[in-house]
Amino acid sequence: MDIDPYKEFGATVELLSFLPSDFFPSVRDLLDTASALYREALESPEHCSPHHTALRETILCWGELMTLATWVGNNLEDPASRDLVVNYVNTNMGLKIRQLLWFHISCLTFGRETVLEYLVSFGVWIRTPPAYRPPNAPILSTLPETTVVRRRDRGRSPRRRTPSPRRRRSQSPRRRRSQSRESQC
């Protein structure tokens, strides 16, 4: 059975596969981030959102995986076999867990549409030959700026690429003024 854990969120395993494995923080850092930002919602008996539920399930899955790893470490006599199991878990399962945690934390932090836009932007950037692409990859934390603009101007067509840093800087004072007017309403 081929199950894509991102499908119901509008993404795919392939879309996340464009991000290199060293892009994702460690599981420990991601768990600390999830706890710091969303502990109350994650521990709540009430349903918050599908991303909270997926995050809970991923955290529980990681806990079970660590229980299994501990059992293997304590019960597998052959050091070579034990190392093979540990390396497989760290390389394959660890990466999948890091991807899931990153995706759902990012969706809760920046919004699903922004994360999907980032994944598409990064996928286009990474597949463009180096001679024809900007030197720096898109940055997720800069995309909410364009998302805010898009939400205010619903009649406009959505942006298809991340603006250049020079363009972003020149627009930010104007954006700040319009945001302050909105907050006064």
Swiss-Prot record:
GO terms for cellular component: host cell; host cell cytoplasm; T=4 icosahedral viral capsid. The modification Phosphoserine is found at residues 157, 164, 172. InterPro entries: Hepatitis_core, Viral_capsid_core_dom_sf_HBV. A motif (Bipartite nuclear localization signal) lies at residues 160-177. Residues 136-185 are annotated as: Disordered. Keywords: Capsid protein, Cytoplasmic inwards viral transport, DNA-binding, Host cytoplasm, Host-virus interaction, Microtubular inwards viral transport, Phosphoprotein, Repeat, RNA-binding, T=4 icosahedral capsid protein, Viral penetration into host nucleus, Virion, Virus entry into host cell. This is Capsid protein. It comes from Hepatitis B virus genotype A1 subtype adw2 (isolate South Africa/84/2001). The lineage of its organism: Viruses, Riboviria, Pararnavirae, Artverviricota, Revtraviricetes.
